[in-house]
A protein has these predicted regions:
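Carbohydrate-active catalytic/glycan-binding domains of CAZyme proteins
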Residues: 1-184
């Protein structure tokens, strides 16, 4: 990402699966922006899907994605990755740049966006359960997009991406990370 419209792959989310990461089978198209809700249905938003993520949770799928000007959290009806999909109330999820999901050991889900904003999600995925907080590293800016959190060896690791100069499209596009003992 970061290369503008020429780098966006289209208006669909497609899935492949593999048991050993060598041989892949095409599952199919699981989302098409023609399904996009009225609040996000501008002509430009229907053209592109940006940074989709899929997560499995208690017998259903969760998906976050970014059309051009909005972001969305969707949940499946059940175990079929092809859906049907339902959008969470858009007020809480609208306008979150490059959203990502993280599930903590206690089952709590968090929405991360803009690389350093995080908020707990309500248990029914109907919105945010808390006001967002910023999780910055102590000594520098970590970036502006491409965020994700993993728990590794008991530490929370926030990954992010940004241009090395902290100026868009100048320098190299780098991966950054920082660690913490708690998620917020």
């Amino acid at each position: 990402s970061g290369l503008g419209r020429s780098s966006i792959v289209g208006n669909t989310v497609r899935v492949w699966k593999s048991r050993e990461l060598t041989n892949w089978a095409y599952v199919g198209e699981i989302w098409n922006n023609d399904q996009i809700a009225a609040h996000a249905a501008s002509a430009s938003n229907k053209k592109f899907v940006w940074a989709p993520e899929l997560h499995w949770d208690n017998g259903k799928w969760l998906m976050v994605k970014c059309p051009q000007d909005v972001s969305e959290l969707l949940t499946s009806d059940g175990s079929d990755i092809k859906g049907p999909w339902h959008e969470a109330p858009f007020q809480d999820f609208l306008g979150k740049h490059d959203p990502s999901l993280f599930k903590d050991d206690d089952g709590t889900w968090y929405l991360i966006w803009g690389n350093t904003k995080i908020a707990e999600i309500k248990k029914d995925f109907s919105g945010l359960a808390a006001d967002p907080v910023n999780i910055f590293p102590a000594n520098r800016k970590i970036g502006h997009e491409g965020c994700t959190i993993k728990k590794i060896g008991g530490k929370y690791v926030l990954f992010g991406t940004a241009w090395s100069t902290d100026t868009g499209r100048h320098g190299t596009y780098n991966l950054y990370y920082c660690t913490a003992d708690k998620v917020t």
